[in-house]
Amino acid sequence: MRVPALLLAATALLAAACAPADQAQPTPSGPAVAGAGDCAKDRLRTREPGRITFATDQPAYAPWFEGDDPTNGRGFEAAVAYAVAEKLGYQRGEVGWTRVPFGAAIQPGPKQFDADLNQFSVTEERQRAVDFSSPYYDVRQAVIAPKDSPVASARSVSDLARLRLGAQVGTTSYQAIKDQIRPNAQPSVYNTNEEAKLALGNGQIQALVVDLPTALFITSSELRDTVIVGQLPPSGDRPERFGMVLDKGSPLTRCVSSAVDALRADGTLSTLERQWLADAAKAPELT
């Protein structure tokens, strides 16, 4: 969710990944998956031969992207993208970025990118429109409220049902409100998390639901008079997971997934999670 400005126009900003190597934290590197076969770099059918183009939204927020600059490789999703590129055999200067709004990226139709990282939860509905890579992060949803409000003392999901709640449209955060909290009043929906945060600050809603790492950033850096009430319990038998979005039927899906799987196996994903998302484990649990 983005987590997660007014509804952004689908304006694509291409930016070559040319940041100096010392701008990003080093990441563990195992054997590349690009040695032979269909996943060899020179056989990958990327939009631009010899380069791979990733996408994310604008603005792009911490802890997923630091400084609204994916090319610096800082932030969890930025670091994952560069680690995937390395596994596929791409040098840092062979990685490009473009900006695509969240909603546009998961709509059916040709994409202006090879893979998009923007806190996309893998759902059956979305899989009918786009491809997803193997998941790179298991996520929970969290509830934010003003520190001085009675909501801040809520300890159970049932305590939230009477509240005016809000979330970004089309997100699993909104779906969590509908499916898990089941509020008495229809939840408010917003085009972006920026609009949702403004509504919380203005008192139009009493609590906001976003993914947990985004909630940590909002409460610590943006809306300092708010607090994480708690994280919602896992929904269903399978955890909610983030995956990269690719064009439906993309020839790259299998190779990108193989790269993600290799990063999980060699410990890189765990290392990056500890580096960028360590505080997520400390949030209180709602029962």
Predicted feature descriptions by range:
Residues 84, 108-110, 160, 200-201, ...:
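Hydrophobic residues within well-ordered alpha-helices
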Residues 104, 120-129, 178-179, 201, ...:
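A ligand-binding cleft/hinge motif common to bilobed small-molecule-binding domains
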Residues 19, 30-34, 78, 82-87, ...:
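Extended ligand-binding regions for polar small-molecule ligands
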Residues 58, 138-145, 220-261, 279-287:
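Periplasmic-binding protein-like
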Residues 59, 73-88, 120-122, 139-197, ...:
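Bilobed "Venus flytrap"/periplasmic-binding protein-like clamshell domains
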Residues 14-17:
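C-terminal motif of bacterial Sec signal peptides marking the signal peptidase cleavage site
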Residues 93-159:
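Acidic, polar ligand-binding/catalytic clefts
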Residues 26-118, 128:
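Extracytoplasmic small-molecule ligand-binding "clamshell" domains
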